[in-house]
């Protein structure tokens, strides 16, 4: 009996020791497939942002082109025909918005902050180019858009900005990107090729893309009168200067993967 009691006491003691030593359970493990805002690296965020920006672009093209096709029907139609009488299904018009804001834009401030701290200037440049591209896509589709308070700091109630604010902001992002691509990376930073699935880490291709987008966006201001693009005016001289530094052949193209 004494032996039996001793065995029980030993078992209880062992269990108490086991559980007291495991108060944090498996907190020591970090799941590389599910990074958090705190431990996600700037290079991993870039690949994620590129994927979602690419998807937002595809959905924008798909939704708009299919809608146009359904609008040509005389009666009835598929999923998108209801858009012709202004009664669209929610998913038909919000998917590009969701993929851009929820998948890409929300990650950009974190990438810029971490890359800046690490002096990974080329990552900052890529993030700025994508930010300009994504928000210009959104304002082309939807008009006025949450811009200045639309990302991580906005929460669930972002405010809307007008087209001029968005245009000038996107052009400023491209100017910043061009500056960043011309800076020398910090000695301990990850190569741009580690996280870049669009240009394979080619800074030259990123620069050409930035100049091309800048020329394209300034050209859209043709009805705003001649002047400086910095003031939201049509700036023909700047367009031509940017085109001289943009892609000159297919070998210079950015490929969205």
Sequence positions of predicted segments:
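Residue-level marker of intrinsically disordered, low-complexity segments enriched
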Residues: 6, 10, 26-28, 246, ...
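Short, solvent-exposed coil/turn linker segments
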Residues: 3, 30-32, 162
């Amino acid at each position: 009996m004494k032996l039996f009691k001793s065995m029980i006491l030993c078992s209880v003691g062992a269990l108490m020791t086991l559980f007291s030593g495991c108060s944090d359970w498996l907190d020591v493990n970090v799941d590389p497939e599910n990074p958090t805002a705190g431990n996600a690296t700037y290079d991993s965020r870039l690949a994620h942002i590129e994927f979602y920006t690419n998807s937002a672009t595809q959905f924008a093209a798909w939704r708009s082109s299919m809608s146009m096709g359904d609008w040509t029907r005389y009666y009835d139609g598929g999923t998108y025909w209801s858009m012709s009488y202004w009664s669209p299904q929610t998913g038909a018009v919000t998917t590009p918005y969701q993929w851009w804001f929820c998948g890409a834009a929300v990650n950009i401030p974190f990438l810029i902050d971490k890359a800046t701290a690490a002096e990974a200037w080329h990552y900052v440049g890529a993030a700025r180019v994508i930010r300009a591209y994504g928000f210009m896509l959104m304002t082309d589709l939807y008009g006025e858009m949450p811009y200045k308070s639309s990302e991580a700091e906005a929460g669930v109630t972002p405010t809307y900005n007008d087209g001029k604010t968005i245009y000038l902001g996107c052009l400023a992002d491209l100017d910043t990107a061009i500056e960043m691509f011309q800076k020398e990376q910090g000695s301990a930073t990850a190569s741009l090729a580690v996280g870049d699935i669009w240009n394979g880490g080619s800074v030259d291709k990123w620069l050409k893309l930035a100049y091309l987008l800048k020329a394209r966006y300034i050209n859209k201001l043709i009805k705003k009168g001649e002047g400086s693009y910095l003031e939201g005016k049509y700036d023909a001289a700047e367009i031509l200067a940017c085109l001289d530094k943009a892609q000159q052949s297919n070998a210079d193209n950015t490929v969205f993967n």
